[in-house]
Amino acid sequence: MLPSTVQTLTLLLTSGGVLLSLYVSASLSYLLYSDVLLKFSSTKTTAPTMSLECTNASNAQTVNHSATKEMTFPPPEPEWTYPRLSCQGSTFQKALLISPHRFGEIKGNSAPLIIREPFVACGPKECRHFALTHYAAQPGGYYNGTRKDRNKLRHLVSVKLGKIPTVENSIFHMAAWSGSACHDGREWTYIGVDGPDNDALVKIKYGEAYTDTYHSYAHNILRTQESACNCIGGDCYLMITDGSASGISKCRFLKIREGRIIKEILPTGRVEHTEECTCGFASNKTIECACRDNSYTAKRPFVKLNVETDTAEIRLMCTKTYLDTPRPDDGSIAGPCESNGDKWLGGIKGGFVHQRMASKIGRWYSRTMSKTNRMGMELYVKYDGDPWTDSDALTLSGVMVSIEEPGWYSFGFEIKDKKCDVPCIGIEMVHDGGKDTWHSAATAIYCLMGSGQLLWDTVTGVDMAL
């Protein structure tokens, strides 16, 4: 809190005596909570002064005997952020397309970076568009290897949301082939994972300082979520996993405060394979995540993490609408909610975001239009219910990417308005040039706004042959 009283004492000395003037300012206070944000800037207070003139007949002269005392009040430290109710709306609409390679014509600093695994994270003042680059641009001469997931050149980069991730626009945060980031209300936390497959390392950066690390625990490609971590009251929660892409891979959550790990959380329940979780706040008490099982099922593992007890449990989503790719026909998996069903090896990160309302909650999901390939992207919603036990089909809201266009990873995030949060889903639209040329992505963003129906899909507008 600010000091309750600020006193400014101005002492004016004159040739005729001492004039003492005491000015006491009114108490300064501020209120900052989940739905109120007051922005302060440095305030300079100057005590009033008096100019005394002395004149004689022989030598007219003006003498200023006043003294001025200035005090600067520093702005209060920003407050931690908390989830708030979502802004009003009943449908998502196309908000933004970031298609860097529409500008891939000239080499140099203005050339777009070759990226993959984009995501967006937001603080109180701005959202940033993150991605993992191969330290190469298009056009350029370093296309070889840009289809690989892991190498020594990959870095976590970001630009302010709405800017094109070119060489000159991008901030390079750290070496990483897997990443995450989030804002706690005061500062950014950046997460990067790199290193050899059998001994990878989580690295944490808070603001400009590299602050902590976390070592591999299964020695099989330690990796993180490729979307935003989630902060409440200064505590940020990050999902990591370590294990085989075609077998067991048990996830953990790291509780991070001001860039330092203060607790690790080992989930219970259906823990065989959980990776690439997309997480958000269902309430001030619970973080929920829709994740990927690359090994056993096309159903999404669904995490509930209690931030009051720091405990987490995982079960499979029970809905008949299967969200992974590849996947069987909807409703074709027999048995209880925990039944895996048939699984073709592979999977994809899925978009997921909450719509928090006073009387109910909406959960929005994305999935590819194709059951077998990373093509197209649809948006689904389910109001209320429990994803662990509710077997009803999800409601199709609309098509964000047509089946003729690429639909790869997707993610969720929330933009902070003045008094509410705007839920959004982003889609990675990959230009897949194979092993012989560049391999990079555009990002489409859809956000909750207004009512009616989702009206228009997104195209990248990129011809790789040009």
Curated annotation (Swiss-Prot):
Q: Which UniProt keywords apply?
A: Calcium, Disulfide bond, Glycoprotein, Glycosidase, Host cell membrane, Host membrane, Hydrolase, Membrane, Metal-binding, Signal-anchor, Transmembrane, Transmembrane helix, Virion
Q: Which residues lie on this side of the membrane: Intravirion?
A: 1-8
Q: Where does substrate bind?
A: R116, R150, E275, E276, R292, R374
Name its co-factor(s): Ca(2+)
Which residues participate directly in catalysis?
D149 (proton donor/acceptor), Y409 (nucleophile)
Activity regulation as described: Inhibited by the neuraminidase inhibitors zanamivir (Relenza) and oseltamivir (Tamiflu). These drugs interfere with the release of progeny virus from infected cells and are effective against all influenza strains. Resistance to neuraminidase inhibitors is quite rare.
Q: Which residues form a coiled coil?
A: none
Q: Name one GO molecular function term.
A: exo-alpha-sialidase activity
* UniProt entry tagged with the keyword Membrane: yes
As given in the record, the signal peptide range reads none
EC assignment: the record states 3.2.1.18
Q: What does the UniProt record report as the effect of altering R150K in this chain?
A: Reduced substrate binding
- BP-aspect Gene Ontology terms: carbohydrate metabolic process; viral budding from plasma membrane
Please tell me where Ca(2+) binds in this chain. D293, T297, D324, G346
Residues annotated as region Hypervariable stalk region?
Answer: 38-86
Q: Looking at the record's lineage, which domain of life comes first? A: Viruses
Q: List the disulfide bonds.
A: C87-C420, C122-C127, C182-C229, C231-C236, C277-C291, C279-C289, C318-C337, C424-C447
Residues with an annotated glycan are N56, N64, N144, N284
- Catalytic reaction annotation: Hydrolysis of alpha-(2->3)-, alpha-(2->6)-, alpha-(2->8)- glycosidic linkages of terminal sialic acid residues in oligosaccharides, glycoproteins, glycolipids, colominic acid and synthetic substrates
* Transmembrane regions listed in the UniProt entry: 9-31
What does changing R374K do? 80% loss of catalytic efficiency
Q: What else is known?
A: The influenza B genome consist of 8 RNA segments. Genetic variation of hemagglutinin and/or neuraminidase genes results in the emergence of new influenza strains. The mechanism of variation can be the result of point mutations or the result of genetic reassortment between segments of two different strains.
Function recorded in the entry: Catalyzes the removal of terminal sialic acid residues from viral and cellular glycoconjugates. Cleaves off the terminal sialic acids on the glycosylated HA during virus budding to facilitate virus release. Additionally helps virus spread through the circulation by further removing sialic acids from the cell surface. These cleavages prevent self-aggregation and ensure the efficient spread of the progeny virus from cell to cell. Otherwise, infection would be limited to one round of replication.
Q: Which family does it belong to?
A: Belongs to the glycosyl hydrolase 34 family.
Entry text on domains: Intact N-terminus is essential for virion morphogenesis. Possesses two apical sorting signals, one in the ectodomain, which is likely to be a glycan, and the other in the transmembrane domain. The transmembrane domain also plays a role in lipid raft association.
Protein name in UniProt? Neuraminidase
Source organism per entry reads Influenza B virus (strain B/Lee/1940)
